[in-house]
Amino acid sequence: MPAVAQTFPAFYLNQGRQRQGIVNGSFDIWQRGTLFTLTTGTNYTADRFNYYHAGGAGTKGAELAYVNPGEAPAERNISNAIVLTRIGVSGEIDNDEFGQKIPGVDYGAGQAVSIGMYLWSDADEVIGSLVAEQRFGTGGTPSPTTRTTYATNIQVTTTPTFYEFTAILPSIAGKTLGTNGDDHLAVFLEFNLNDDILLYTTGWQVNVGTAVLPFQRKSRGEELADCLLFFERQNVAGNFLPSPAMAWDSSHVLANLTFTPKWRPPNKVALSIVPRFQYWKDGYARSFSAESWGYADATETTIQGQFEVSYDPGTRGLTYVWQASSGSPVWIDVSSEL
């Protein structure tokens, strides 16, 4: 009878990040959405996981997938996966990567670190390599990245299979960290150049030691709390915002919006918004012609933002109710991703 993994409270996880360096390894948290078209550069998908698109032609995507009952991941109480799609790929001059950044380049340094995950595909395929990179951060004069290759030419079949790898990471004695506090250990799969593939993966496990420890899921609430340390999205699309205090010149309204994240940003903060607002007058929605967004107090627990919208001077002095324009969701993202 196969062993069935259980959901453990965090204090049973023996102990902290040495026991499991990966956050959201069973792909349960998807704050940014569940379907992604990947573009050149870094693309965050399921929380904490990112796909680095190095360029070239073709269609690349990522999407939430589900584990079928009876498949191997389900025996460990894993129900979700991610599927990475590469179609018609050509012209790549560098390798695409998919994985996660573990905060602190000291993780497992000078020790054996083991990595495990489920992999399967729609046909027999070959993954280029599994890599760990010790990245010493930015700012100042940090030491150059060191690279450890765990495996090359990883054979993947249509059956979900758990793969296990172990390597000894270099010591970081004598190395120099950057001054921005963003040093980390990056663990990622690296795709072969110009390789079309449809790859499923879940159950990521990274731990210090010479063997991959059994995958143990945290509760969804605990996993979300860990994800919120790095990224938080608040959707204001469906919310009516109270009429704000206004200041204007001949053609602009300024309105304050206060957003309180659930955590104190540890490294940096970047707010992004798609601020297509509309106002209501005489029972009808009226759109503003232009908007912009800025923010202040970014290092404080409460982040105060201000958006500016142009308006018809004839409406000045009315009471406004703010709402997202139809079909245009408004997000506020607070990120301290490495």
Region spans (language model):
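Extracellular and organelle-lumenal recognition/adhesion modules and their flexible linkers in secreted
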Residues: 4-338
